[in-house]
Amino acid sequence: MSARFTVKKLGAQGDGIAETESGDLFIPFTLPGESVTAARERDRAALMAVLEASLLRIEPACRHFTECGGCALQHFEAEAYRQWKRDKVVHALKGIDCSIDELVACAPHTRRRVVLAARRSETGMLLGFNRHLSPEIISISECPISLPEIVAALDRLRALADLICATTKSFRMAVTVTGSGLDVAVYESGKLGEHQRRIASNFVLAQGFARLSIDDEIIIEPRKPVVMFGSVAVAVPPGAFLQATEAAEQAMAEIVGTHLKRAKKVADLFAGCGSFALRLAAKSEVHAVEGDAAALSALDRGARFATGLKRVTGERRDLFRRPLTFKELNTFDGLVFDPPRAGAEDQSKQIARSDVPFVAAVSCNPVTLARDLRILIDGGYQVKSVTPIDQFLWSSHVEAVALLDKPRRRRG
């Protein structure tokens, strides 16, 4: 049953929040000050109509907005949206003495990697994103966050999903734009028979895709998918982690590189395929530490075949179970760490005890970043600046890069 509500503020996930007698009510796709009708179910409600619109409401960029759950904030005026994103970092770091820069904006049509949901239905193959907080898949024909190469291939990717589908359940298709073409990594689509493998392989060849892998097994690889990290070409493994946009990666690399420019020997923790390590190696020796063997192998190959780099070494290590100790860290004079959303609490405790003079912390979660920064501050580090980066356009997520140093008097 629908009722009328007045939205008071935006929540952390970008939902509008209305205050009711029974507590806060979360209404997606609404803005502060709006009067709306919505169908309530416990503490959430589905938007039915906007009765009085905010002056900050704009036309969304995509026809699928409000059905597709991929974006939360296309209806929010650009400047107000950017301020809200920056404020997420400000609020998370409340109580930490630091300068927070303006948000680094990222343009539409720049996301190079998307994870699509797929499922065979009675009407055909669905390929797109899940509806907001729902397992239902909204099949898409456009996507204004994604690179044009992905959007132009949606029909062909849908056809490929149909060819490889061997399950009645939904499955995932990660699509990455590389210098060699589209890298398609599929997960949980079911076991392929030999006939299906041949048909899928022929389709990939005909469509010019660089690679098809299923559950990390390479089905066919006409060309190795290559990504540039600065001047270094890296052949990335199936399902490799990459920053969402190349522009955001470049912005982060420049911020980190400037901070660590005086370091002669740098540690890159949670190094992935080398997006920081291989750029930093242009000026510094780098020791890259990463838990994923395939990613570390890709980094190593990229370094070995590159020219003009300082020495690059690699170490496979689970930094959650076995963080580098402060004694190990003391052999470096610069450090960057870029952990998953959970942050790097145990590793931060070791960094805090170390004498590394220059540290850069990269995070996609301001809450865990705040926790890790507090650990470093308590260990004698000073936060020089924090830069929010909007690489997850129109979502509630925001990246941030924090730069720290430890004054000489606080070392040892």
Swiss-Prot record:
Main EC class the enzyme belongs to: transferase
Annotated catalytic residues: 364 (nucleophile)
Source organism, top-level taxon: Bacteria
Protein residues bound to [4Fe-4S] cluster: 62, 68, 71, 143
A GO MF term: 4 iron, 4 sulfur cluster binding
Residues annotated to bind S-adenosyl-L-methionine: 243, 270, 290, 338
Entry keyword Transmembrane helix: no
Record Gene3D superfamilies: 2.40.50.1070, Nucleic acid-binding proteins, Vaccinia Virus protein VP39
The protein's Enzyme Commission number: 2.1.1.-
Keywords: 4Fe-4S, Iron, Iron-sulfur, Metal-binding, Methyltransferase, S-adenosyl-L-methionine, Transferase
Leader sequence segment: none
PANTHER family given in the database record: 23S RRNA (URACIL(1939)-C(5))-METHYLTRANSFERASE RLMD (PTHR11061:SF49), RNA M5U METHYLTRANSFERASE (PTHR11061)
Listed name of the protein: Uncharacterized RNA methyltransferase mlr7480
